């Protein structure tokens, strides 16, 4: 159901005098939520490291269309010019498909959880290929902010990806459910092959990295 209230994303300056009035970057008239309802997961929102751009997950639909569609996308808001673009649809400054005309959009499944590279040149995120299939494989995708090129890093890896972290600008780490366990994996985009780093009869729920050290939550 829809109660007529929606979660929006605001950006505002915080100075000595407190928080100044913020800008609703979703749009005051937008009748949808950021982060996505019903979980409102803050992991769907990510500042770049320079603090100049904000990536977020959004599904700009209303009513029944919002309820039945899995076509969420990653949007990037630029603080300098106030413009937003959708990185999951063909990028040429305007949409290349018309939903009203029955055209099928590119990447029609869930696209969520953006993670910026340390140099802010790339965004890693999770993507599902098929529309309407919430149990579809969760693929690890990489978007190049300069060329707008998109790369499926786990195309030949038959497991879901989750909890993505960057190691420098050239390697990504993540958790994958493998044969009733959860293991830590890594991949260098230029090498193109996933390496399963941990092994054993356990579930790794979360992990963090510092240099050559990894701390993991294991059960």
Predicted regions and their residues:
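Hydrophobic beta-strand positions that form the internal "hydrophobic ladder"
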Residues: 54, 120-124, 153, 171-174, ...
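A flexible loop/linker signature enriched in serine peptidases of the S9 family
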Residues: 1-10, 27-42, 57-75, 86-112, ...
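Short loop/turn segments that connect beta-strands within beta-propeller blades
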Residues: 14-17, 78-82, 144-148, 188-192
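Residue-level detector of Asp-centered blade-edge/turn motifs that repeat once per structural unit
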Residues: 49-50, 118-119, 167-169, 209-211
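Blade/loop signatures of beta-propeller domains
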Residues: 5-21
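A structural motif specific to WD40 beta-propellers
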Residues: 20-23, 85, 151, 195
